[in-house]
Structure formats: structure tokens, C-alpha cells
Amino acid sequence: MSIYDLIKKNIQSDGRLKKDFRILDEDVWKSNDDGQEDVQCLEYIDNMIEADIEGLLDIIFKIKDNNYDEIEKELEIYFENYRDTILIYREPLYKYFGKNKISISSLNNIYNFFKKMLTKSRNIFIIKISIIILNSLNLEYNIELLEIIKILALCSEFTLLGVLLIKTLKNIDINKEIYELAKKVYAWGKMACIFYLETNTNEIEDWILNESTEENILYNFGAITYSDKADIRKKLKKTSFKKNEFSKISFLIYSLLFLDTEKGITFLDYKEELLINYLELAKSIELSETDYLTIEEISSYMKDDIYYMEELGGEMRKDEYFFPLEISNKLLKECEEILNNRN
């Protein structure tokens, strides 16, 4: 059974796959979930090393309308031991097809073969390279191709590449397509959608905020992306909140403070405003355990920052401080005030 047919067979009545659906071989990709290898590269997707595509192009330009099986076998051999992200093929293939004049007959052969591979192949990397190559051809809107991509993209392993292709199509509502897909995928697939989703409505911002607590935000970049797209900075300027809304903001702030050695919050240019507004609101509303946990984390971080400034200040540059000393002391005092009044 092809991967496409496997995905299609497992689509539930709600249009989604089960959350535990997986196509990666656990014996080969033991520590990776579907989509992780590619989506975790989003942080530097526009500055990646580029694959040497000479060998791949040799295979591509052998394609004729009567040798699909032979070409598929060559591609299987080409990707047999491949374990890197497929994204390193994007730019060199985009550049090649964008700069070189290729005959109409060759382009037709390439298009027809790789479109066929989307629904026929049982090889993950052949499907991925097919999406990238089809994307490189600068296609006009094609409803049949779009429907195939939307089915493949339900699996997190293909979501990012599906979104990248959808983004290039013309005469469709791109953001609507990405939003609808985002609501059907999980984890790394959802992260891929949210990264490219334009949050041009309150509905989308609120949805992203709600989803942040449903998914495991596994690293800084994820926490930063969810926080920016949900626009928690803007939300903390409000005076009233929907049920659990403040706690969801707390969860994201906690994630920004807690994850990784290099805290995600340090990369925000509005971190001071964010924490000041958060703590000011926290003093005036009924708090949940999640809120208190976040405030404890802020307190801990401020204590560490104050220690480094007071004990090691002479050895540190000003830009190495999390906040100026007076701001850190102010935030710590507010944290202690809230925690001391805890019921």
C-alpha cells in the first residue's frame, strides 16, 4: 500500500488522523516523531546548507513517460541511507528550475512523474522530494494536486512541505487553507502550520493560544512562535479575560522561561513589558496553579539574574544581563508579594 493510500485509509470522520498515527520506522527514527526532523529546522530554514543535487538531477532528466518504475527504483537507491532533513534540497532545486530553461516536454515528464509518486510511492523521501520538485516548477493552481497535498499533509511528516507548496499556489485563499490544515494536525505538523499562519483575526490568535496547552512545546523556538502568533503581548493589555485565557498565557510565559539553558524569553525585544504587565494583572485576578507556577519561575529567574549582576557584575557586559538590576528587583518584589498572598 502506498503512503498516500495508508494516510487516506486512516482519516477519521472528523477529517483527522489519530494523534498517535506514525509513518516513521521506530527502529530507524527512535527519537524522532513524524515531522520533527524538518520542522525543527524552521528557525533557520532560509539559511540552511544546500545539498549537492547533481546526482539527483541526473536521475530527474532521465524521466520519460514509459520508465517510471526504473526512475522510482533509482530514487529509492539514492535516498536509501538518507537521514538528514530534506529541506536542504529546497533552495538548490528552486534555483535550478528557476534559472535554467527546460524544454516543455521535459517539464511535463517531470511534473507527471512526481505527481504520480505522491500517490504511488511507499518511500517517505521520494514523496518529500516530489513535493519539493513540484513546488520548484512554479505551478499554477491545480485543484487535483492541492487535494493530494492536503491529504498527505494530514500526516505531520509531510505537513511542512505541504504548507510550503500551498503558499506558492495562486488564486486560492492561502491563509484559509493553512488554518484549516492546522486544525487537523498535531504536534510538529501543527507547529509548521502556525509558523506560516498569518494571525490576521482574533479567532486565529485565540485558537493558537488555546492550542499551545494542547501540544508539547518542546523547545525555545516553539514557545516563541506560539507566543508571537497568539500575540500574548497584546492580550496582556486587556483588563478582562475569557475562562482559562490568563492561565494559557501563563503556560506560554512559563515555557519561555523554563525551556532550554538559553531561555526563550531572552530573545523577545518586549520581555520587560511582557513580565511587568503579566505580574500587574496577576495581582488583580484569581490565579490558578499554572499561574502560580509561572510566577514562581519568574521569581527564580529574577533571583538568579540579580545574583549574577551583584556577584559577577564586574565580569559581565551590560547586554548579558536579563534586565537592569532595578527592573529585576521590581519584578522579584512583585512575585514575592503575589506568592505571599497565596491562599
State where each predicted segment sits.
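Long internal repeat-built scaffold domains in very large eukaryotic proteins
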Residues: 2-74, 81-96, 106, 227-343
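Eukaryotic alpha-helical solenoid repeat scaffolds
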Residues: 57-127, 131-135, 189, 202-223, ...
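Structural detector for internal amphipathic alpha-helices that build alpha-solenoid repeat scaffolds
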Residues: 91-101, 125-139, 159-170, 190-200, ...
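Well-ordered, non-transmembrane segments within structured domains
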Residues: 96-161, 278, 331-338, 343
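Alpha-solenoid HEAT/Armadillo-like helical repeat scaffolds in large eukaryotic proteins
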Residues: 113-121, 145-155, 165, 177-185, ...
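Residues within HEAT/ARM-like alpha-solenoid scaffolds
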Residues: 121-125, 129, 153, 157, ...
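Flexible loop/turn segments at the boundaries of HEAT repeats in alpha-solenoid HEAT proteins
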Residues: 137-142, 172-178, 203-209, 219-220, ...
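Long alpha-helical HEAT/HEAT-like repeat alpha-solenoid scaffolds in very large eukaryotic proteins
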Residues: 179-266
